[in-house]
Amino acid sequence: MNLALRAKISYILSHGLFWCTYCISWSYTACFLTSKGYNSFTVGLVTGLGAITSVILQPVTASLAGKIPFLNDKRNAIILKIISLVTAVLIMAGFPGSLSIAVLFTVLTAIDASIPSILSTLATSYINSGRYLNYGAARGCGSLTYSVFSLALGIMVSHAGTDILMILYIFFGVLCILAIAAFPANISETGNNSVSDNPVNPSGSRERTGFLARYPYLYSFFAASILLYIGHNIYNIFLINIVNRAGGDSVNLGTALAISACVELPVMAYFVRLENKIPVEKLMIISSIIFTLKAFSAIFATSVPAVYVVSFMQIGAFAIFTPGSVYFICKHLKPSDNSLGQALLGSCTLGLGGTLGNILGGFIIDRTGITAALVVAAILSAFGAILIAASMKTCMQPHKTT
């Protein structure tokens, strides 16, 4: 098998298998913990702490890869996945209702929220070494796998109970590690990820303030990413509430999720060709506008067909923004800064965006209902789109680019 084909297959498998484990640790958190005797407050606390911990964990792992020669993106992903497998085994051995399971599940969710940014860095480092890899296609396959596996998992849990979740997690986790290990070596794998022109202090650690000073437009870009993902997560996490408001049921929920996943795949798969025709900066602005239109449309989605239309709008929102943000970081940051840049992006989107979307959405829904939550999501998305436009304008100025 030639190098290019090996990279393509192993990277697609890495995403597909990883998102199967992510589906278990995040989408089925409430299902698993409530079956073990935990209440809704504890479930929310576990997912919230997991997301917050990932915000810290992602930059830390990126920084360690820049200081310790043995560590690189590939080994970081493998080490974290091994830790998650050990955690899953300990969860299986725990006692229902005990604090240990909640603590261990927090660790599990934190690790799985941290790995996507490492997988992104793995791809961009490979691309920066002068080789071709279609990140969007792999990420799109991950989205499709996530959707299909989520539906299949619901059927399996209904027949076998929640204990099957950790068994499946371990099974797919082992396969994920093998897929990542099969990914061919790149520049970063020969040693330190950051042996180039990245300033370090005497102890060898990166100065994050210096990092953001080199790329001032990242302040507004990361802030915009948080706002857009808060709106995105309010819609996704509480989609069942939107479907119920429209008079639908769990079948309609599954259909809405399937529509979102199906429209993501072709856009992500052909993102490289799309970027060749439209600059990534313009694509980011377009996606943020569609994010906002989708958020406002959700407010008025009071019928099941309308919910399906909103889900279809994923084609220009999340489907463009996800690969676009990764390629944007890769394009504008020096290769030595790429790992930290991708880690901070993950912290802002899956980390802070996910946490705040979950907490804020739940808080508003409990007090005033789903419509009010969607109004807030739309307003935040609009501010996010404005900040995206501002950051893109700044980064395209000749003296600001790298």
Summary of predicted features, one role per range:
Residues 57-71, 157, 267-279, 365-366:
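Helix-to-loop junctions at the C-terminal end of transmembrane segments
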Residues 75-90, 282-297:
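Structural signature of the two symmetry-related core transmembrane helices
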Residues 108-141:
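Cytoplasmic helix-loop-helix junction between adjacent transmembrane helices
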Residues 165-182, 372-391:
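Symmetry-related core transmembrane helices of the 12-TM Major Facilitator Superfamily/SLC fold
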Residues 1-5, 184-222:
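Juxtamembrane intracellular "pre-TM" segments in multi-pass secondary transporters
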Residues 2-51, 217-256:
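Helix-loop boundary and gating motifs at the non-cytosolic
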Residues 339-367:
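A late C-terminal transmembrane helix in Major Facilitator Superfamily
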Residues 16, 98-116, 226, 306-320:
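Hydrophobic core of transmembrane alpha-helices in multi-pass small-molecule transporters
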